[in-house]
Amino acid sequence: MAYTPKPENKFSFGLWTVGNIGRDPFGDPVREVRSPVQLVQLLGEVGAWGVNFHDNDLVPIDATAAERAPIESDFKKALDENGLVVPMATTNLFTHPAFRDGAFTSTDPEVRAYALQKTMAAIDLGVECGASTYVFWGGREGTETDASKSPADTGKWFQEALNFLCEYVMDQGYDLRFALEPKPNEPRGDLYLATVGHMLAFIETLDHPEMIGVNPEVAHEHMAGLNFTHAVAQAWNAGKLFHIDLNDQNLGRYDQDFRFGSHNIKQAFFLVKFLEDVGYDNPRHFDAHAYRSSDYEDVKAFASGCMRTYLILKEKAEQMRENEPIQALLAQITEYDGSIEGFRGKDSSEKEACIKAH
């Protein structure tokens, strides 16, 4: 097998992933800045299907209307020339100093209003570029000390913001759905809605839960020491797996965003197997980063490697499904003779009595 990515694989990368210049809290950038057009060209060369962006990955936060127009025009032209689409967009609500104590959960109502304004404009930009999924990662929605604000209040503010934005999308007639991305910590000491389970419960408290799903990320669940495949399965069973972020991570560490499958190959295999077994057909987004020691040629190899790893694991999953000894063992351990069929399904008083008497 050639392991060549195809459009039906729906492999995508963020501008911030292949465009990462290698800055970290302890070191300066190690790669030069590449423009969105250059990054689209890079992704076209490696055979990616899609490219995603935060609003300010594409348009600088201080750009004027006159400056913005050619940026958008050049980006759309690059998409066409390189055969890429924009499946997802999102808002940067974490870099600007205004968001240092939260965006939708800031104690300052003016900051919360600014977060809504910025997100509405970013939604417009994303839809204009073709996005059908809009991700919310609350990078500053949290605390270092719970003395600073009540989680009861911040939960209500977060609900109000998402309810407002759902109504905005409906008022505009956009064909867009939201995907909430959990993370346990970083950059805040503790982030609200830390895991997939938290997000699934939160979604059901909103006014339009049918519009909202989740965007689980391998690294984020592994930071909490959880089994990512189980989290993905829970989201799938709830009908909420709208998007997924693929990378790799040592359990219990800071957010490492390693190349997909580079550390936990067994977990990566069972994740790919699950996605392929259930027929997941939404974007497969590699929210990962090349090593800081990499140049841009290595960034290209990194991007190709993410997709190649997925395709290799997909092939291995197919081999497992077709392996007769393995399937015979699975059939043996799940064998059922029908002897308790009368107890299965919806509860009734008769079934309760039968189970007690069995």
Label each residue range with its predicted role:
Residues E8, T17-G19, E45-K156:
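Structural motif corresponding to the early beta-alpha repeats
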Residues G126, Y134-G138, A152-N185:
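Glycine/proline-rich, flexible active-site/cofactor-binding loop segments
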Residues V51-D55, F136-G138, L180-K183, V214-E217, ...:
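Short beta-strands and strand-loop turn motifs
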Residues R112, L116-K118, K183, N215, ...:
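Functionally constrained cores in energy, signaling, and assembly domains
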